[in-house]
Each structure stands twice: as structure tokens, then as C-alpha cells.
Design a protein with these regions (language model features):
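Contiguous, small/hydrophobic- and glycine-enriched helical/loop subdomains that border
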Residues: 1-21
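Conserved, helical-rich catalytic subdomain that frames metal- and/or nucleotide-binding sites
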Residues: 16-159, 174-187, 192-214
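Flexible helical/loop "lid" subdomain adjacent to adenine-nucleotide binding pockets
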Residues: 161-163
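Conserved glycine-rich beta-strand-loop-beta hairpin in the small C-terminal domain of fold type I
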Residues: 166-169
Length: 214
């Protein structure tokens, strides 16, 4: 089983640890518009890992530094959403499970995503380290991220990033109009893009069960 699979056994907003095989449910964020860019270029995941390992050796990076960054992100998330969990206890433990079999954690989070993420400063901790090595090998992907970001425009993305090791990228937007505008910019640059929306956990499982019945 691939390390990407456990996420889809829970759905919604989750915390993934290690290679992604350890996953904990978090309070759901409000649905947000998203654009997924799927460039024609391919990226070798094994090569991306080798390049990242080489960069870590070159810069003297250690696993402890990554762990510290994860702890800072977790504190920022908990502070922003007032998620009080006993130390060492996974989110949602001991609560009644929903249709997904996953206990709810504090309910869906009200308020616009911009307030939940941007104003709390959590976006400053969101990063994909693969960008540092993948963009060196594939500069066109860095340009696609720039297009998705739309910096300096009224319809700028809340966040844009490489997805995993690539080559897909994504952008998050407050409004559908902003997402459609970003998708239009991609298509004008000859890059395939898809406008979609994130799903909270309950909606994810509702649609999964309906699809299974069909």
C-alpha cells in the first residue's frame, strides 16, 4: 500500500506524519476553491528524494530541524483553532465516530479560510521542501507556481505549491472567480488546469458512499 493511501481512509483535514502512513483527523477547514495544474513534464520521485538527501548533506540539515518545524506548525494550528488535546492523545480519540468511522474533532471551523490561515500566520509555515530541488531541475514548474499565485493581483491565491514531488501543482483561492481566473492564466500558458473545491470530512464520506452504491 502506498503512503498516499491512509489519507483517503479518513478524508477532510488531517495531520500526516513520517511517510504519510500515520494520519490523524483535525478539525475541518471551511471548503476552499482550488486549481490543480497538471503540466506535461514528468518528475521522477526517486530522483527528487535523492536530490533532497544530497541537499540535506550539503547544508547540514538534520531530522531534528524538520521535527522542530512540525512542532511549530502544530502549535500555530492549535492556537488558531483552540484545539485542546491532552498530550500524547491523537485528535478525536474517545469521541463518537461519524459515518467515516473517524471521531469528529471540534466540528467544522467557521469563518473564511483567509481568517483561519492567513491572519493567524499559519501559511508562513506551509511549505514543500521538494520545491527547492524539483524547481532546479524543472524551472517551468516554478513558473507555473508563479502563474497560480497571481501575486500582485486582486485574485491572488491564498497559497500555491508543488504537490508532493510533482509535477502537479495547486493553488487555493477564496472565491470561485479567483480560481477560474487562475485556471484561465494556466490555459493561456498552455498548461492544463482543473477548478475544484476541497471537501470536509462528512461530505467526502457522503459522496464516497453514494459512489459505492452506484
Amino acid at each position: 500500500m502506498g503512503s498516499d493511501v491512509p489519507l483517503f481512509l479518513i478524508g477532510g483535514t488531517v495531520l500526516g506524519l513520517d511517510r504519510g502512513q500515520e494520519v490523524y483527523p483535525l478539525p475541518d477547514l471551511e471548503p476552499v476553491w482550488c486549481v490543480v495544474a497538471t503540466p506535461a513534464v514528468g518528475v521522477s520521485t526517486p530522483q527528487a528524494f535523492r536530490d533532497w538527501d544530497a541537499l540535506c548533506v550539503e547544508e547540514g540539515l538534520t531530522p531534528e530541524a524538520s521535527a522542530d518545524k512540525l512542532k511549530q506548525l502544530s502549535r500555530a494550528y492549535a492556537g488558531a483553532f483552540a484545539v485542546g488535546l491532552p498530550e500524547g492523545r491523537p485528535a478525536g480519540e474517545g469521541r463518537r465516530a461519524g459515518s467515516s468511522g473517524v471521531p469528529p474533532v471540534g466540528g467544522d471551523l467557521a469563518g473564511p479560510l483567509e481568517s483561519a490561515l492567513v491572519r493567524t500566520g499559519i501559511t508562513s509555515w506551509i511549505a514543500n521542501d521538494f520545491e527547492r530541488v524539483v524547481f532546479r531541475q524543472h524551472p517551468s514548474l516554478a513558473e507555473i507556481k508563479r502563474i497560480l499565485s497571481g501575486s500582485g493581483t486582486p485574485e491572488a491565491a491564498l497559497h500555491a505549491s508543488l504537490s508532493g514531488s510533482g509535477s502537479a501543482l495547486f493553488g487555493l483561492y477564496q472565491a470561485r472567480e479567483a480560481a477560474e481566473s487562475a485556471c484561465g492564466r494556466l490555459q493561456a500558458a498552455g498548461v492544463q488546469g482543473t477548478v475544484t473545491r476541497t471537501l470536509p470530512r462528512d461530505r467526502y464520506w457522503s459522496e464516497m458512499l453514494q459512489a459505492d452504491e452506484r
